[in-house]
From Swiss-Prot:
Active site, renumbered: D44, E116
GO molecular function annotation: double-stranded RNA binding; metal ion binding; ribonuclease III activity; rRNA binding
Reactions performed catalytically: Endonucleolytic cleavage to 5'-phosphomonoester
Gene this chain is encoded by: rnc
Name of this protein: Ribonuclease 3
Family classification: Belongs to the ribonuclease III family.
Species this chain originates from: Xanthomonas axonopodis pv. citri (strain 306)
Length: 226
């Protein structure tokens, strides 16, 4: 197949004219340069655009809030990591010795970043139209599973709306600790309510994920008391 990098049955579904793009997309910063962080940055924007466009056309009657929640659900770290596993990225990543030893090829954050980097690599290799044609099928099952126009609100939003409906003070999110290397951060956050009095702690690979987990646990406390 000319000089393109492609293996029959490759779940990525694209034959790279420039093999260096794919190699860089799969190279974690722990393995040295050129790594995939710049590609990840570009890919994040492209994925958000692709999903926003798909939802806009599929849900013609959905309001902005429903579209935003649906996009957030589809592009969250965990959802992208599932795609990364479907594409068998874990076994193809180039990792440094430390990440190899700690099981970085299984970590959601690394897999999600690699998915975004590969999206950018495809875009740079062949343009937006081809990128859309290759990437959207990765999300098809998740898109089809979403109730039309009724994507579930994230825990922080649900908690905020529960409190606002009762005219109660909004929660406070406090960072307890931040640990780990730059490429493998762990955040420990507390969600604190004044009224009703409640507190829960969450952890995650980003502060947002830790806050969402803490909010989920506070909601569970509120549900158990009603």
């Amino acid at each position: 197949m000319s000089n393109r990098t492609f293996q029959r049955g490759d779940p990525i579904g694209h034959a790279f004219a420039d093999p260096a793009l794919l190699a860089q997309a799969l190279r974690h910063r722990s393995a040295g340069t050129p790594h995939n962080e710049r590609l990840e940055f570009l890919g994040d924007g492209i994925v958000n655009l692709l999903i926003a466009e798909a939802l806009y056309h599929r849900w013609p009657k959905a309001d902005e809030g429903a579209l935003t929640r649906a996009r957030a659900e589809l592009v969250r770290e965990g959802a992208l990591a599932v795609i990364g596993r479907t594409l068998n990225l874990g076994e193809r990543l180039t990792l440094g010795p430390g990440e190899l030893k700690s099981g970085g090829h299984r970590r959601d954050s690394i897999l999600a970043d690699a998915v975004e980097a590969i999206v950018a690599a495809i875009y740079l290799d062949c343009g937006f139209e081809r990128c859309r044609a290759v990437v959207l099928p990765w999300f098809e099952a998740s898109l089809a599973a979403l109730p039309v126009g009724k994507a579930e609100k994230d825990p922080k939003t649900r908690l905020q709306e529960w409190l606002q409906a009762r005219q109660l003070p909004l929660p406070t999110y406090a960072l307890i600790s931040e640990s780990g290397d730059e490429h493998a951060k762990q955040f420990h956050v507390a969600c604190i309510l004044e009224q009703p009095v409640a507190r829960a702690e969450g952890q995650g690979t980003s502060r947002r994920l830790a806050e969402q987990q803490a909010a989920t646990l506070v909601i569970a406390q509120l549900d158990s008391n009603t």
